[in-house]
Amino acid sequence: ACENNFSDRECERRKKDCDSSMKFRELSCPKTCGTC
């Protein structure tokens, strides 16, 4: 189960990481913030 446990600011930061980092994408929950 995936849940968004991040603030909006953290979510935006993670979204940028998802867009630029395949490693981040692989290690993170795909549904985090609905961005990965």
UniProtKB/Swiss-Prot annotation:
This protein's UniProt keywords: Disulfide bond, Nematocyst, Secreted, Toxin
Keyword hit for Disulfide bond: yes
Domain of life where this protein originates: Eukaryota
Major subcellular site: secreted
Every ShKT domain range: 2-36
Known tissue expression: Predominantly expressed in mesenterial filaments (at protein level), a morphological structure that has a functional role in prey killing and digestion. Also expressed in club-tips, tentacles, actinopharynx, body column, mesenterial filaments and pedal disk.
InterPro entries: ShKT_dom
Transcription regulation keyword on record: no
Site (Buried residue in the protein structure. This inaccessibility may explain the lack of activity against ion channels): 24
Compartments in which it is found: Secreted; Nematocyst
Short name of one Pfam family: ShK
Positions of disulphide bridges: 2-36, 11-29, 18-33
Additional note from the record: Negative results: does not inhibit human voltage-gated potassium channels Kv1.1/KCNA1, Kv1.2/KCNA2, Kv1.3/KCNA3, Kv1.4/KCNA4, Kv1.5/KCNA5, Kv1.6/KCNA6, mouse KCa1.1/KCNMA1/BK, human KCa3.1/KCNN4/IK/SK4, and human voltage-gated sodium channels Nav1.4/SCN4A and Nav1.5/SCN5A.
Family classification: Belongs to the sea anemone type 1 potassium channel toxin family. Type 1a subfamily.
General function of this protein: Probable toxin with unknown function. Does not inhibit all channels tested. Is not cytotoxic on macrophage.
Protein name: Kappa-isophellitoxin-Tst1a
Organism: Telmatactis stephensoni (Sea anemone)
